[in-house]
Swiss-Prot record:
The keyword Lyase does not apply. Belongs to the TRAFAC class OBG-HflX-like GTPase superfamily. OBG GTPase family. InterPro entries: G_OBG (IPR031167), GTP-bd (IPR006073), GTP-bd_Obg/CgtA (IPR014100), GTP1_OBG_dom (IPR006169), GTP1_OBG_dom_sf (IPR036726), OBG_GTPase (IPR045086), P-loop_NTPase (IPR027417). Coiled coil: none annotated. This is GTPase Obg. The gene is obg. GTP binds at residues 165-172, 190-194, 215-218, 285-288, 315-317. Pfam families: GTP1_OBG (PF01018), MMR_HSR1 (PF01926). It comes from Chlamydia caviae (strain ATCC VR-813 / DSM 19441 / 03DC25 / GPIC) (Chlamydophila caviae). Its main location: cytoplasm. Disulfide bonds: none annotated. It is an enzyme of class 3 (hydrolase).
Length: 335
């Protein structure tokens, strides 16, 4: 199961204790204070990276703790600082405080770092307390505890193109054709059970970097109310630059293809109104099942019902129309 949300308790390291110690040298039988300070506890840092795609490495982990600072030593030696603990998370990670639900940070780019829990300060050794009136202090202080925080990490995938559609609309087959990869396909609902990322080469611009495409698990009517795979995956649509609606042009037993498109649009609108303003292309898939005259007739019907939308007819299975779709990607994303 794709792990895109976790709750975890983070504990920074405790500061090391200061110590009471005395100089013990041959010609100084009553040497002065010589106890060192404790080391600083390790902090916990969260860092985003492009090579990480989920929270899989933190599965079943309830808490993480940075290293404690070490106690001071004689000869005025300070204890070693605790090592920082760095959590590497994917781009697109939202960090929330579990108690307040406040968004602490949005890791939208590669290499962003945040110190989420600071290590405790080290305690003071008795040397620190030496004064002109107190030449032999016997006082030392313990290290301070590190910060503790319970946080929620939620991933919203960042991609150029997000494929959305009903189960069995042919999304995974089209994804495989576009990204030249192999995602499991099958004639049953929810073949795609987790978001899958791929790269679509730009065929019209030689030095254009590939587009990142995300195959989002199939949406069903009521997804915004958490039906089917529901809200867990609708949120991944938010971070895409362009939506590719994939509709089976032949429809299915329960509804017409035109009705499928209307429901898809409504689901996204109900989930978040501003998704209606996101750029989109409508891919009328599986044209290999229709005769040329039937294709044109259905396209004209879609254009009549949805006059403001951009349509492309294609077949993810045979590859027909995919070059045209790639050209549309270039036109819409190279701005």
């Amino acid at each position: 199961m794709f792990l895109d949300q976790i709750t975890i308790e983070l504990r920074a390291g405790k500061g090391g204790n200061g110590v009471v110690a005395w100089r013990k040298e041959k010609y100084l039988p009553k040497g002065g204070p010589y106890g060192g300070n404790g080391g600083v506890g390790g902090s916990i840092i969260i860092e985003s990276a492009t090579h990480v795609y989920s929270f899989e490495s933190y599965r079943n982990i309830r808490f993480l703790k940075a290293e404690d600072g070490q106690s001071g030593a004689t000869n005025n030696r300070s204890g070693r600082n605790g090592k920082d603990l760095v959590l590497v998370v994917p781009e697109g990670t939202l960090l929330r405080d579990v108690e307040t639900r406040e968004i602490i940070y949005d890791f939208a780019k590669d290499g962003e770092r945040l110190v989420i829990c600071r290590g405790g300060k080290g305690g003071k050794g008795n040397t620190f307390f030496k004064t002109s009136t107190n030449r032999a202090p016997t006082k030392a202080t313990p290290g301070k505890p590190g910060e503790v925080r319970q946080v929620e990490l939620e991933l919203k995938l960042i991609a150029d193109i997000g494929l959305v559609g009903f189960p069995n609309a042919g999304k995974s087959t089209l994804f495989n054709t576009l990204a030249k990869t192999e995602v499991k396909v099958g004639a049953y609902p929810f073949t795609t059970l987790q978001p899958v990322l791929g790269l679509v080469p730009c065929r019209e611009k030689l030095y254009q970097k590939p587009w990142i495409i995300a195959d989002i698990p199939g949406i069903i009517e009521g997804a915004h109310q958490n039906r089917g795979l529901g809200l867990d995956f609708l949120r991944h649509i938010e971070r895409t630059r362009l939506l590719l609606f994939v509709v089976d042009i032949c429809g299915c037993e329960r509804s017409s293809p035109e009705e499928d498109l209307r429901i898809l649009m409504d689901e996204l609108l109900h989930y978040k109104e501003d998704l209606a303003d996101k750029g989109r292309i409508i891919a009328l898939n599986k044209i290999d099942d229709l005769l040329p005259d039937e294709r044109q007739e259905r396209l004209e019907n879609f254009q009549r019902l949805f006059p403001s939308e951009q349509f492309v007819m294609l077949s993810g299975l045979t590859g027909e129309g995919v070059d045209l779709l790639n050209s549309l990607f270039t036109n819409r994303l190279s701005v």
